[in-house]
């Protein structure tokens, strides 16, 4: 008879609290068509809590506020330049994100000093539902709307001493709405509002780029593996 005994490897679990600061760019029906060009003119700030439950995997919870804008006159497309519409919007976002390190990050071993990482998750966003009044090119605020979104991206992080980490990341937020720029508003008064325009089959994207600084703490436990 062969008795199989599970082998459990237990290590200290570290947690982090931190702040992300950077900029955004928007991809949709109004403004530039550049895919990745975050700008500090549309800033983004996010508080986060992270639980590193292994040397490669972490769960990140976020609460952030970001601004976006689109200006047709800055676009390289002639039709958008001629149309000359513009908007600005404020985005509140709450996210749960799974982060995967390329290299092992063992906080008890200073030789584990840096790693690239990938991440994906689920977000819930609050934004302003906009519309364009008749004969006007600047979007007006109508009401607040909510939607889900999928954050995904890449980054790199490095340790600063024993307790601090500095990171840089690029995040793409795919939203389940096409209303961030006012191109498909929720109509209240169709007499005073311009009709919808653009591609209704393509939802809006927001690109984030910036730096994070976090503080690590805690000595909980996690199970690394079973045999």
Residue map of PLM features:
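Outer-membrane beta-barrel translocator domains and adjoining extracellular loop/strand segments
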Residues: 29-34, 72-78, 109-112, 129-137, ...
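Predominantly the C-terminal beta-signal and adjacent terminal strand-loop region
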Residues: 161-227
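Short loop/turn motifs that connect adjacent beta-strands in outer-membrane beta-barrel proteins
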Residues: 11-14, 55-56, 104-115, 160-163, ...
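Gram-negative (and chloroplast) outer-membrane scaffold detector with strong preference
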Residues: 55-132, 217
């Amino acid at each position: 008879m062969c008795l199989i005994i599970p082998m459990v490897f237990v290590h200290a679990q570290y947690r982090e609290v931190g702040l992300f600061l950077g900029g955004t760019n928007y991809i949709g029906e109004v403004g530039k068509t550049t895919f990745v060009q975050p700008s500090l003119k549309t800033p983004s700030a996010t508080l986060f809590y992270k639980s590193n439950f292994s040397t490669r995997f972490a769960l990140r919870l976020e609460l952030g506020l970001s601004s976006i804008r689109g200006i047709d006159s800055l676009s390289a497309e002639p039709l958008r330049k001629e149309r000359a519409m513009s908007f600005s919007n404020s985005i509140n976002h709450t996210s749960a994100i799974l982060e995967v390190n390329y290299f092992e990050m063992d906080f008890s071993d200073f030789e584990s000093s840096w790693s690239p990482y990938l991440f994906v998750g689920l977000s819930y966003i609050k934004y302003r539902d906009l519309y364009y009044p008749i004969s006007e090119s600047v979007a007006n605020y109508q009401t607040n709307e909510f939607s889900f979104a999928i954050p995904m991206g890449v980054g790199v992080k490095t340790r600063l001493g024993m307790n601090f980490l500095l990171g840089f990341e690029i995040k793409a937020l795919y939203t389940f709405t096409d209303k961030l720029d006012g191109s498909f508003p929720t109509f209240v008064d169709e007499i005073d509002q311009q009709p919808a325009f653009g591609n209704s089959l393509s939802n809006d994207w927001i690109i984030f780029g910036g730096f994070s600084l976090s503080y690590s703490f805690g000595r909980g436990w996690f199970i690394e593996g079973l045999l």
